[in-house]
């Protein structure tokens, strides 16, 4: 039985069709357990996930030029096992694995591989965004681990009736509902004027490629604790704190702007069943807030918290519809934001560490992921950035350090205004204030400056002596 694509799937389909033969719609991650597991039982557990989560078995085709999907029959699969002597050898494999395209039609949209690295077992999975999202990968980790433990004790795994196909009917009902009409009205009225573009970095020419690279860093336990303590005491989420710091930075480097816009992903799963179902649900929303240089960091956090509550009530409305409405209303092309900010905290009870791999492409100039999924005492910050815009990972590292510096200031002095926030790191301030102004040189101490000037003029009479703006 063939079914139409949902709106989130259609967006991925269009993207993959445009960037054919690329890995742009791949999503890839792995989990490593704290010990070695039996690969035969782990293979059975993975197969059980494929059997029960029918969304994994979705396959795609075109009928009369339109995309369609169907659930392929389940057949037991031999999951390959790869053994690596070092983490470095595994990293080479994983990064290559993540960047191998998944074919759009004619076959399965995922690939599992069991891996063993330095005495630890785990598995890596790559899937098309047509059938999965970041939440789905948390389900993989949780369910496959649970299935392994159940099978290892000889117990039976209960059946479930989770099917992504059910979401097609849910979406159809939403598109005919009063809720949809209210959401459409909200977003149509949200931007009476053209939203100001919050540019992260100016480019002398249009970006023609979406090739990307990735940079990651980890906060210290002390910094992580100070962030968590501040958020708890202030009654705000960690996502809001990180977003506030990024918005303050964007406001400072876009001096003329009176508002700042970033993109945020939304789970788009409203029921327990949807939260237990593998599939592509996730959507994007523009988050726009007024930012004045005189508002305090505390006020910015409060404004963002209110903005979250407001737009989350209308999160089901498709982003492409939002974008189309604004484009038609204000006659513009392009995107609404340069920066996507994603705070990931979906927990799993699996006793292991998750890792995520880049597919080598990035739709947005900069995508920042703040990861708090492994019950760790340290946040991981990952930046995917377009290499045509940003020259190197050193540039991204500097940018992240600026953001972390702003967060530190907000945490220690929340009444600091946006205008007062330092947007340079301590090392940058040292360079700008002291190193660049270190003009001391040796010169003959027995002569006056006007004598030295006269002698220099006699030696090089045709050289420029003074520059003022465009005059010499």
List each language-model region with its residue ranges.
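Active-site-proximal acidic secondary-structure segment that organizes catalysis
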Residues: 2-4, 8, 115-165, 393-412
């Amino acid at each position: 039985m063939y079914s139409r694509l949902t709106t989130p799937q259609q967006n991925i389909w269009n993207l993959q069709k445009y960037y054919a033969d690329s890995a742009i719609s791949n999503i890839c991650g792995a989990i490593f357990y704290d010990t070695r597991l039996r690969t035969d039982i782990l293979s059975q557990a993975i197969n059980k996930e494929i059997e029960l989560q029918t969304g994994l078995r979705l396959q795609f085709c075109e009928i009369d030029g339109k995309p369609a999907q169907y659930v392929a029959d389940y057949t037991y699969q031999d999951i390959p096992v790869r053994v690596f002597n070092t983490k470095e050898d595994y990293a080479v494999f994983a990064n290559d694995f993540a960047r191998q395209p998944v074919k759009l039609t004619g076959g399965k949209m995922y690939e599992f591989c069991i891996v063993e690295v330095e005495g630890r077992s785990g598995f890596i999975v790559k899937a098309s965004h047509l059938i999965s999202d970041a939440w789905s990968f948390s389900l993989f980790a949780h369910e496959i681990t649970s299935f392994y433990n159940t099978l290892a004790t000889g117990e039976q795994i209960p059946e479930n009736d989770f099917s992504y196909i059910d979401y097609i009917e849910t979406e159809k009902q939403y598109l005919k509902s009063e809720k949809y009409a209210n959401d459409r009205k909200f977003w149509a009225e949200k931007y009476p004027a053209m939203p100001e573009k919050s540019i992260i970095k100016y480019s002398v020419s249009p970006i023609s490629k979406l090739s990307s690279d990735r940079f990651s860093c980890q906060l210290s336990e002390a910094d992580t604790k100070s962030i968590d303590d501040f958020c708890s005491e202030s009654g705000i989420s960690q996502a809001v704190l990180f977003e506030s710091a990024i918005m303050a930075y964007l406001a400072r480097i876009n001096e003329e702007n009176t508002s700042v816009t970033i993109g945020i992903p939304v789970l788009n799963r409203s029921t327990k069943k949807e939260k237990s179902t593998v599939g592509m649900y996730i959507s994007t929303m523009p988050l726009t807030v007024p930012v004045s240089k005189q508002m305090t960091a505390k006020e910015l956090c409060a404004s963002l918290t209110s903005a979250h509550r407001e737009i989350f009530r209308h999160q089901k409305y498709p982003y492409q519809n939002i974008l189309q409405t604004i484009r038609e209303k204000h006659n513009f092309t392009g995107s609404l934001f340069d920066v996507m900010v994603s705070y990931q905290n979906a927990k799993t009870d699996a006793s292991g560490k998750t890792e995520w791999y880049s597919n080598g492409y990035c739709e947005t100039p900069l995508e920042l992921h703040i990861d708090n999924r492994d019950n760790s005492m340290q946040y991981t910050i990952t930046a995917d950035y377009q290499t045509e815009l940003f020259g190197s990972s050193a540039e991204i590292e500097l940018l992240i350090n600026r953001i972390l510096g702003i967060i530190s200031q907000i945490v220690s002095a929340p009444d600091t205004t946006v205008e007062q926030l330092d947007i340079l790191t301590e090392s940058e301030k040292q360079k700008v204030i002291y190193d660049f102004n270190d003009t001391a040189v040796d010169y003959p101490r027995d002569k006056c400056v006007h004598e030295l000037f006269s002698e220099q003029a006699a030696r090089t009479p045709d050289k420029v002596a003074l520059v003022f703006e465009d005059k010499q």
